[in-house]
Swiss-Prot record:
Protein name: mRNA-decapping enzyme subunit 1
Organism: Eremothecium gossypii (strain ATCC 10895 / CBS 109.51 / FGSC 9923 / NRRL Y-1056) (Yeast)
PANTHER family assigned: DECAPPING PROTEIN 1, ISOFORM A, TRANSCRIPTION FACTOR SMIF DECAPPING ENZYME DCP1
Gene name linked to the record: DCP1
Record-stated family: Belongs to the DCP1 family.
Description of how the protein assembles with itself and partners: Component of the decapping complex.
Localization: Cytoplasm, P-body
Main location: cytoplasm
Keyword Transferase listed: no
Length: 193
């Protein structure tokens, strides 16, 4: 039997998902389906030269979502002022043909700049390297990797940069790891039921 409390919790969760979907849509109009979200995440970057994690200025809702990727779509060219700050702290802005079926975003509560990682299944990256070598020379991409260590979900992005995402809830941490691992190891999907 469903109680009023269960109905309220379900309604609140649906509201949160809808709100997150709409907010993400302002930053990435190609959002197609919200796959997972958690209310609190903090981003760290691994500095190999210093052999330590540096905490970045990104904290907030973390979401992983499916993107609407068309065969010949090009990534939009970012505004110069927006990309300059992001490149200094979070790596290069991707350009060229849009092969990024999924994305991870942290909707930042600290400042207006959000953190995002483009996610392409490793099979897509490998096919690009094989069938589009000229594109790979212009913008080389490497297969991504993900692991859980201590309290961080560690992600090696397409540019070999390593980020650690601290997730408040251990269950959410494991769910994010499992989802990212699935997205990287399987062929891209057009939708999730």
């Amino acid at each position: 039997m469903t109680t009023a409390r269960d109905n309220s919790a379900t309604t609140l969760e649906l509201y949160r998902k809808t709100l997150n979907f709409n907010v993400i849509g302002r930053y990435d109009p190609k959002i197609k389906q919200l796959l997972f979200h958690t209310p609190h995440a903090t981003v760290y970057k691994w500095e190999a030269g210093e052999n330590k994690w540096n905490k970045l200025e990104y904290q907030g809702v973390l979401a992983i979502y499916l993107r609407d990727v068309r065969e010949q779509a090009e990534l939009p060219v970012p505004h110069q002022e927006a990309s300059a700050g992001a490149e200094g702290r979070c790596g290069e802005v991707l350009s060229g043909r849009d092969i990024y079926n999924y994305a991870l975003i942290v909707l930042n509560r600290i400042n207006p700049e959000n953190f995002s990682i483009a996610i392409a299944p490793n099979s897509v990256v490998n096919k690009r390297r094989l069938f589009s070598p000229e594109e790979n020379v212009q913008q080389p991409l490497e297969p991504m990797d993900v692991e859980v260590k201590d309290e961080l979900v560690i992600i090696k992005n397409l540019r070999k940069e390593v980020y650690g995402i601290w997730i408040h809830t251990p269950t959410d941490r494991q769910n994010i790891y499992d989802l990212l691992k699935y997205l990287l190891e399987n062929e891209p999907k057009d939708s999730f039921a």
